[in-house]
C-alpha cells in the first residue's frame, strides 16, 4: 500500500474533514461520505485505505450524535435495537457481495429512486412536522423488516446515501417527524451498521491507525455539535438539510 507521509498537517486535515462530514451528516441524516471520502482521496490515500478510514469515522457518528439525541429523549429504543440487529447480517452480506460485484450499474437506478423520493417529500409538505408514531402490529413489524433488509444490504454494498433510505422509512412508514427520524438514523445506523463496516476493514488490515485519533475525535465532536444544532433548529431546518443532501447524493449517483 502506498500510504503518503502522515505529517501533522495531513492528520489535522483529516480531523477537520471528519468534523465537517459528521457535523453535516448529523443534520442531514446521512451523507458523510459525500464530504469525507473525497477529501481523504484528495489527500492521497489509496481508495481502500480511504474507505476504511471513512468507515472508522462514521462508525463514531452514532456515539456522538446518539448521545446528544438520547439526552434529548429522541431515541425509541425498540426501533433502535430492531434497526441495528435486523440490519447487521445484511450489512455483512452486502460488504462481502461488494468484493465480487461492483455496484456501478445500480447507481443510476438508485439515483432516480432517491430523486423520486425527494419529489414525493416535497409534495407531501406536512409529513415532516407531524410526530405521530404508528402503532405496530406483528404484520407491520414484518413488513418494516422486509423494507429494512435491502437498505441494510445496500449500506454494506454501495454505502452512498444509505442513511437517506432509512430516514425515509422512519418518516413514511413509522410516521416520525424529521427530528426523530434523523435521530434514529444517526443512532442506529451509526452505531450498528457503520461499526460493522469499520470492523470489517480493521479485520482486513485496511485502516491507517495513525489517522484514527483525528478521525474519531472529529467524528465525535462534529456529530455531537451537529445533533445539538439540529435539536435547536427543529424540523423545518432539518428537512431542508435532508432534502438538499438527498438531492446531491442522487445527482452524484447519476453521474
Task: Give short role names for the model-derived ranges.
Residues 1-12, 41-49, 96-105, 202-210, ...:
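Helix-coil boundary and interhelical linker segments in multi-pass alpha-helical membrane proteins
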Residues 64-74, 111-136, 228, 248-255:
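Transmembrane helix exit motif
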Residues 93, 148-158, 196-205, 249-255:
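Hydrophobic alpha-helical transmembrane segments in multi-pass integral membrane proteins
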Residues 11, 55, 110-114, 118, ...:
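Residues within membrane-spanning alpha-helices of integral membrane proteins
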Residues 52-105, 109-112, 194-244:
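Selective hydrophobic functional segments
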Residues 1-45, 132-182, 213:
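Selected transmembrane alpha-helices and immediately adjacent juxtamembrane segments
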Residues 45-54, 78-79, 175-186:
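Membrane-interface alpha-helices at helix entry/exit sites of multi-pass transporters
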Amino acid at each position: 500500500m502506498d500510504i503518503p507521509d502522515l505529517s501533522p498537517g495531513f492528520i489535522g486535515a483529516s480531523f477537520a474533514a471528519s468534523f465537517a462530514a459528521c457535523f453535516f451528516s448529523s443534520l442531514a441524516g446521512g451523507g458523510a461520505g459525500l464530504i469525507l471520502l473525497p477529501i481523504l482521496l484528495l489527500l492521497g490515500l489509496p481508495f481502500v485505505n480511504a474507505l476504511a478510514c471513512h468507515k472508522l469515522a462514521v462508525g463514531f457518528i452514532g456515539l456522538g450524535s446518539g448521545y446528544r439525541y438520547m439526552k434529548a429523549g429522541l431515541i425509541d429504543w425498540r426501533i433502535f435495537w430492531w434497526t441495528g440487529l435486523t440490519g447487521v447480517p445484511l450489512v455483512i452480506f452486502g460488504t462481502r457481495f461488494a468484493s465480487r460485484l461492483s455496484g456501478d450499474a445500480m447507481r443510476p437506478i438508485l439515483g432516480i429512486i432517491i430523486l423520486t423520493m425527494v419529489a414525493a417529500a416535497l409534495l407531501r409538505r406536512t409529513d415532516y412536522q407531524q410526530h405521530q408514531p404508528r402503532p405496530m402490529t406483528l404484520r407491520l413489524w414484518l413488513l418494516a423488516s422486509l423494507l429494512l433488509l435491502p437498505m441494510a444490504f445496500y449500506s454494506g454494498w454501495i454505502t452512498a446515501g444509505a442513511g437517506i433510505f432509512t430516514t425515509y422509512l422512519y418518516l413514511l412508514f413509522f410516521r416520525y417527524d424529521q427530528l426523530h427520524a434523523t435521530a434514529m438514523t444517526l443512532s442506529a445506523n451509526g452505531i450498528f451498521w457503520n461499526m460493522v463496516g469499520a470492523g470489517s476493514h480493521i479485520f482486513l488490515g485496511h485502516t491507517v491507525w495513525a489517522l484514527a485519533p483525528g478521525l474519531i475525535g472529529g467524528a465525535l465532536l462534529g456529530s455531537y455539535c451537529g445533533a445539538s444544532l439540529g435539536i435547536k433548529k427543529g424540523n423545518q431546518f432539518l428537512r431542508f438539510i435532508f432534502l438538499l443532501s438527498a438531492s446531491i447524493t442522487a445527482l452524484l449517483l447519476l453521474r
